[in-house]
């Protein structure tokens, strides 16, 4: 989860988020190299009084600065497309959870079970227990098994919402009348916090998301207790 004065991303807890972090570093390095080269050329032009007349109209230079950016864009696009396909791929999910956005709470339905659904509201600040996080705790956490592929179906009952959990690399729009899907898989147990990431009204800031990833045995006991 995030902490005060954090400068980087949250710690990755899923293969998708790890890939996104690597892609971020890859792209940032390319941007840094390009910026350094441009700054060097500008500095060189400002500090020298010499002018090479043949470079003012040289087809070779124009060819280079056309082909080189195209190659750089390809180096950025290829890993980006790979990650996009990974995020959209859904192969034999072990569990399907339907998520509905409301003003201003989330509701969840475990579609593989006959009657397992609940609403998830933010706990008011006045009701928080010691150690709980302000504006992030909910009365009903989404309990899921770790190290298993889970399909999330996301939609909305009223206005646009967005279901996002940064440490898992998840952000899916909840659109009324449309069912979007995404997959998640956590490589470790723990609590993972998120929030609605689409302005949806006056209480938009009070729609937290809490996922509790646990071993399969613990999840089975929890699901039995909820039925």
From Swiss-Prot:
Keywords: Copper, Electron transport, Magnesium, Membrane, Metal-binding, Mitochondrion, Mitochondrion inner membrane, Respiratory chain, Translocase, Transmembrane, Transmembrane helix, Transport. It is a multi-pass membrane protein. It is an enzyme of class 7 (translocase). Cu cation A2 binds at residues 196, 198, 200, 204. Cu cation A1 binds at residues 161, 196, 200, 207. Gene3D superfamilies: 1.10.287.90, Cupredoxins - blue copper proteins (2.60.40.420). Residues 1-14, 88-227 are mitochondrial intermembrane. It is found in: Mitochondrion inner membrane. One of its GO terms (molecular function) is copper ion binding. InterPro entries: CcO_II (IPR045187), CcO_II-like_C (IPR002429), CcO_II_C (IPR034210), Copper_CuA (IPR001505), Cupredoxin (IPR008972), Cyt_c_oxidase_su2 (IPR014222), Cyt_c_oxidase_su2_TM_dom (IPR011759), Cyt_c_oxidase_su2_TM_sf (IPR036257). Mg(2+) binds at residue 198. Residues 46-59 are mitochondrial matrix. GO terms for biological process: ATP synthesis coupled electron transport. Its EC number is 7.1.1.9. It comes from the Eukaryota. Binds a dinuclear copper A center per subunit. Its cofactor is Cu cation. The keyword Oxidoreductase does not apply. Its main location: mitochondrion. It catalyses: 4 Fe(II)-[cytochrome c] + O2 + 8 H(+)(in) = 4 Fe(III)-[cytochrome c] + 2 H2O + 4 H(+)(out). Component of the cytochrome c oxidase, the last enzyme in the mitochondrial electron transport chain which drives oxidative phosphorylation. The respiratory chain contains 3 multisubunit complexes succinate dehydrogenase (complex II, CII), ubiquinol-cytochrome c oxidoreductase (cytochrome b-c1 complex, complex III, CIII) and cytochrome c oxidase (complex IV, CIV), that cooperate to transfer electrons derived from NADH and succinate to molecular oxygen, creating an electrochemical gradient over the inner membrane that drives transmembrane transport and the ATP synthase. Belongs to the cytochrome c oxidase subunit 2 family. Component of the cytochrome c oxidase (complex IV, CIV), a multisubunit enzyme composed of 14 subunits. The complex is composed of a catalytic core of 3 subunits MT-CO1, MT-CO2 and MT-CO3, encoded in the mitochondrial DNA, and 11 supernumerary subunits COX4I, COX5A, COX5B, COX6A, COX6B, COX6C, COX7A, COX7B, COX7C, COX8 and NDUFA4, which are encoded in the nuclear genome. This is Cytochrome c oxidase subunit 2. It comes from Balaenoptera physalus (Fin whale). The gene is MT-CO2.
């Amino acid at each position: 989860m995030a902490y005060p004065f954090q400068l980087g991303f949250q710690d990755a807890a899923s293969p998708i988020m790890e890939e996104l972090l690597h892609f971020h570093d890859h792209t940032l390095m390319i941007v840094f190299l390009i910026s350094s080269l441009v700054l060097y050329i500008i500095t060189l032009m400002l500090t020298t009084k010499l002018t090479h007349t043949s470079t003012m109209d040289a087809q070779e230079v124009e060819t280079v600065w056309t082909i080189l950016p195209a190659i750089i864009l390809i180096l950025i696009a290829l890993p980006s497309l790979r990650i996009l396909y990974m995020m959209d791929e859904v192969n034999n999910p072990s569990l399907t959870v339907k998520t509905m956005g409301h003003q201003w709470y989330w509701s969840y339905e475990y579609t593989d079970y006959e009657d397992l659904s609940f609403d998830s509201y933010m706990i008011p600040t006045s009701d928080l227990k010691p150690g709980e996080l302000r504006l992030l705790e909910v009365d009903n956490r989404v309990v899921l098994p770790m190290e298993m592929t889970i399909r999330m179906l996301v939609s909305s009952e009223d206005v646009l919402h967005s279901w996002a959990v940064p440490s898992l690399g998840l952000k899916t729009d909840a659109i009324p009348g449309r069912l979007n899907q995404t997959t998640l898989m956590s490589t470790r147990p723990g609590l993972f916090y998120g929030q609605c990431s689409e302005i949806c009204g006056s209480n938009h800031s009070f729609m937290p998301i809490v996922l509790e990833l646990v071993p399969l045995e613990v999840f089975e006991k929890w699901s039995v207790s909820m039925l």
